């Protein structure tokens, strides 16, 4: 089951051409968050919107900060070019790599895959949004777990 989901997600990353609902996202985001969101690859923006909408449908009481974190949780992938073939390869392999210095080439792609929550959190000013983005792969809080679950359902 896990492998099937993983392969489906990798093919979507490679082939996806879905236009993100930027109007939905920009209506929720604040200040510099909008610029950060717009710097993201359209695939990552569309994914963030789907995660935010899934959370909102499941938890209508979701705090705005949670929805903003959902929209920005993969913003760290925008730190360097992250090509479709790199997304597929690093989705299959995940060697331990340090977050810094950020490298070019394939090593940099592995860094982005592993450390994108950190890279995104470092660019977000709101402490609540920052904390949720940082924990979206290793949730510590209730809303962090809910964000993680909504992200994993992709």
Each predicted region: which residue ranges?
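Non-catalytic interface/linker regions that flank or bridge core catalytic/transmembrane domains
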Residues: 1-36, 139-140
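Divalent metal-dependent catalytic cores for phosphoryl transfer on phosphate-bearing substrates
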Residues: 31-154
């Amino acid at each position: 089951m896990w492998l099937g989901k993983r392969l489906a997600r990798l093919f979507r990353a490679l082939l996806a051409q879905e236009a993100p609902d930027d109007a939905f996202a920009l209506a929720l985001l604040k200040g510099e968050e909008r610029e950060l969101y717009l710097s993201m690859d359209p695939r990552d923006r569309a994914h963030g919107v789907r995660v935010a909408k899934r959370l909102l449908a499941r938890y209508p009481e979701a705090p705005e900060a949670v929805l903003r974190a959902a929209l920005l949780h993969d913003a760290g992938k925008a730190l360097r070019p992250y090509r479709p073939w790199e997304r597929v390869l690093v989705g299959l392999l995940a060697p331990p790599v340090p977050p810094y210095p950020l490298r070019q080439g394939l090593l940099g792609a592995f860094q982005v895959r592993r450390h994108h929550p950190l890279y995104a959190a470092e660019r977000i000013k709101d402490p609540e949004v920052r904390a949720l983005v940082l924990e979206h792969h290793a949730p510590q809080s209730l809303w962090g777990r809910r964000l993680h679950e909504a992200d994993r359902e992709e």
